Amino acid sequence: MTIKPVSQERLPELLRTIPKAELHIHIEGSLEPELMFALAQRNGVSIPYPDVASLRAAYVFDNLQSFLDIYHAGTLVLRTEQDFYDMTHAYLARAAADNVLHAEIFFDPQTHTAHGVSADVVINGLYRACVDARVEFDMNASLILCFLRHLSEQEAFECLEQALPHLDKLVGVGLASSEMGHPPEKFARVFARARELGLRLVAHAGEEGPPAYIWSALDVLKVERIDHGVQAVQDPLLMARLARDRIALTVCPLSNLKLRVFPTLAAHNLGRLLEAGIVATVNSDDPSYFGGYINQNFTQTFAALGLTAQHAYQLAHNSFEASFIDDRLKRQYFDRLAGVFETFE
């Protein structure tokens, strides 16, 4: 579809208006300090910050591991099914306001089972919020269980076993947490089992890790989509493979900036990925920690890189193409997207 030009003044409004899917959102990373405090009080959990302001000030980190440390500390307040419902509902309300029509939500049950919270409690709370979003926000949402790669293969198998009663509530599995020193092939057998169970497969690769991790995720884990993947540009053969096979990258620009994957947003390679014909998408990753939900990722990245309305259409189209929804719903979303561009002035 050829897109008519939109002025720089009107472009932010277009970016806010376009329908889109979000495919890389860790629900625990959407926990805002205000809700964290409320849940801590509700559950009698002590947190080492006297007020919301001091907690916000603690959201300062310069690499993936230091972020993960505060991220996991924040999850201690999540104890009941209602807590997980409230957190997910808050994200879905915010996403709906950003014109997200479909979200595929990551969650990591191992974080919570380590705190004595059962996988049943986690999944039921998340799923109930997704079901309610269909009526309340006219929004589709599904769940992707993420294994934590710094833990063992055996622990990942145990996590999958605990989720078996809830397979109907899950669309897929993923692989998250600190990448360095934890190559994808560590989890080859777990992903093979998940595939046998009919789950879709994705994995974080090539965020801080090398292009070799992306190759492994594709060829050993057999994933259908790569989360992050920005290091692919180091490998021309990999770039060609991603473009040829329409393998999507769920890119998270503000996350990359916050974790210093790129020194500035202007140095980000999103534009280069699109020019190479790769199915790149824009996502928020852990929005409460990285300073931006999906529309802030769009508006700030477009401003920094000088991207255009044509790029906006391509990224939104890519997000629906790369999603795990059925073809009928994809066509509906493609039509809605085209309609916005046809009528936007």
Swiss-Prot record:
Name the source's superkingdom. Answer: Bacteria
> In this chain's numbering, which residues are marked as the site (Important for catalytic activity)?
H228
Q: Where does Zn(2+) bind?
A: H24, H26, H204, D285
Catalyses which reaction? adenine + H2O + H(+) = hypoxanthine + NH4(+)
List GO terms (cellular component aspect).
cytosol
What UniProt keywords apply to this chain's record, in alphabetical order? Hydrolase, Metal-binding, Nucleotide metabolism, Zinc
Give one GO molecular function term: zinc ion binding
Q: Where does the signal sequence lie?
A: none
Q: Which HAMAP family match?
A: Adenine_deaminase
Functional note: Catalyzes the hydrolytic deamination of adenine to hypoxanthine. Plays an important role in the purine salvage pathway and in nitrogen catabolism.
Know the name of this protein?
A: Adenine deaminase
Recorded source organism is Albidiferax ferrireducens (strain ATCC BAA-621 / DSM 15236 / T118) (Rhodoferax ferrireducens)
